[in-house]
Each structure stands twice: as C-alpha cells, then as structure tokens.
C-alpha cells in the first residue's frame, strides 16, 4: 500500500510522461509535491522502485519509467483529450521501437510513420549558431506528431539531461511561436543563437532554464527571444 505522497509522485511522473514523453526533473517533482528538498523525492522514488511501481533506466541521468499504477489510481484517472500522445522512440541497430509512455503498453514495431525534415543541430548547452537548412529526413510515428507542422533537430550538449534529453538524441519539434511556462522549447536568441531550454517568465523577462545544475538560467528581454517550436518527443538510437 502506498502513502499519499508516494501516490502523488507516481501520478505526477505518469502524467508528465504522457504529456511530454520525458520524466520530470527532481526540482519539478519537489515543487509539485511541495517538499523542502530533493532528498524527500529520492526517498519516495526509492520506495516506489522497491514496490515495483517504477524503475530507474540505466545509463541515463535521473530517467524513470512507470511500470504500473495501483488499481485505485488507474480507475480514477480520466481519459486524456489531447490529439496526440508524445513518447520517446528508441532505435536498436536501425530499427525504431516505441517505448511505452503508459503502463501495460507492449513495445511494438512502429508501422505508421511520417517523414519530417532534420534541420540541423540544436544546442542543449552553450547556444550554437541558428538552425540550419534541411539536412535529411527521418520517419516518425504518426501518433507522436498529432496536428501542426513538425521538424527534427539533433541535440548537442548535456544541459537538458535531467529532463531525459541526452547528447546525440533527435528531438521532435512542433512549430510554435508561443509557449507556456514549463514548456521545453527551441528558442532563437538575438536572431542568431538557437538553444533547447525550458521556457519560464521572470516578470517581463524571459528565462531559458537548463535541466542540469552545471548550467545557469539565462535571462533575456522579451524582444531578444523568439520561440521556434515546442518539444513533442525524441528519438534515441543505439549503435
């Protein structure tokens, strides 16, 4: 039997994975549960792991997977009405496989896909030059895309590792010019630097927040930052 805090954390991780395809950071979990420190989150995650509700994914920074939900929680979760269900796609020796973003889903080979352009590299670290032209196309599952126009970018850097985004990943981006606080976005700074960061507001300013304590949050005036798109999923290949 889970405690109330354990249930709250499990549901928060589950819902975030369904929404964005990547697990929440420890800071986000701490804030969501109104805890004073991240040590409390560590204890809750350990307890959930010991009871078989989640597991930590090896060789990834703080990456988690929900294995199951208690029956009482499953029956109380309303069906989602969003038009798409972003997820992480992992490739093994060239074959793409869908990694389930909800419990009890079986991993199956992706059949229905759409081709989208890869527009170059995006910095998850120190911003690099602005997004380049189309370099090649990749196939992405239709269920990841939903509505709107999409493109892909190859990630360079480690500033988003606590959001489950690693150096070498390919992120799937939906075209957008606006974002909500907490969204992971492609931001163009001063019309010349492109970076992948979490979008925040600091009064009238815009904060581009990393998911790695080694990187500082960067603050800009609203006229210096243009939103180029929002993260809907990512692709990871193993060679």
UniProtKB/Swiss-Prot annotation:
The record marks 124-125 as: Cleavage. One of its GO terms (biological process) is proteolysis. Its EC number is 3.4.21.88. Pfam families: LexA_DNA_bind, Peptidase_S24. GO terms for molecular function: DNA binding; serine-type endopeptidase activity. It comes from the Bacteria. The keyword NADP does not apply. Residues 26-46 bind DNA. Keywords: Autocatalytic cleavage, DNA damage, DNA repair, DNA replication, DNA-binding, Hydrolase, Repressor, SOS response, Transcription, Transcription regulation. The active site is at 159 (for autocatalytic cleavage activity), 197 (for autocatalytic cleavage activity). It catalyses: Hydrolysis of Ala-|-Gly bond in repressor LexA. Represses a number of genes involved in the response to DNA damage (SOS response), including recA and lexA. In the presence of single-stranded DNA, RecA interacts with LexA causing an autocatalytic cleavage which disrupts the DNA-binding part of LexA, leading to derepression of the SOS regulon and eventually DNA repair. Homodimer. Belongs to the peptidase S24 family. This is LexA repressor. The gene is lexA.
